[in-house]
Amino acid sequence: MMEQKTSLSSGAMLNAYPDSIGGTLQNIIGLLQRPEMSDAFRDFYILPSIFNTDLDRGFSVIDYSLNENYAGQEDLDALHHMGITLKFDLILNHASVLSPQFQDLLSKGEASPYKDFFINWNKFWEGHGAMTPEGYIQPDDELIRQMFFRKPGLPILMVRMPDGSEVPYWNTFYQEIRYPELNPLDLVRT
C-alpha cells in the first residue's frame, strides 16, 4: 500500500492579485524580501492566477502559460527559495474567446472537437422557454427569476459559425467576438 503524504500549512498566507502591490509578481516578491516581512508568510495565494487571460482579472483564460506581464519562471523560483508555497486557482471552467479551443469552434463549428467545451444556450434551455426572433431561447421566468447575472440582460454571445448561422452560447463574462471586416470585393472574388 502506498503511503499518502499530506501537507497542511500553519502559517499566515498572503492573498493578492498578480497585478497588485506594484503590478508584478516580482514587485510582490521584493516586498516579501524586505527584512520586516522576512518569514511573515508561509503561503502566497494569487487571485486567481498568473496565466494568460484577457478579462475579469484572470478568470477568462486564453492559455495556461505564464502571463509574462505579471510573472516569470524566475519569480516562481524566488518564491520557492524563500520557502513560500504558491497557491492559485486552476481555472478550468472559464475560457476566453481568444483561447485556441474557442477559435477552433469559430473555424470548424459543429466539427470542432471543442464544441462541447462551451455551453450552447439553446441546447441548455431547450424545452424550458420560447425562441425569440433574435434566435435564442428566452428561459421561462420561474427558472431564471432567482439567478444572478453579472450585468443586465441574459449572458448570451451570438457566435457566427463557418456556415454563416449564428448560435447562442452562454457568456458569463459578456465577451465579444471581433470578426474581421468584410471587403465587398472578397465576396465577388473566386
What do the predicted segments below correspond to?
Residues 3-189:
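Acidic/aromatic-lined carbohydrate-recognition and catalytic surfaces
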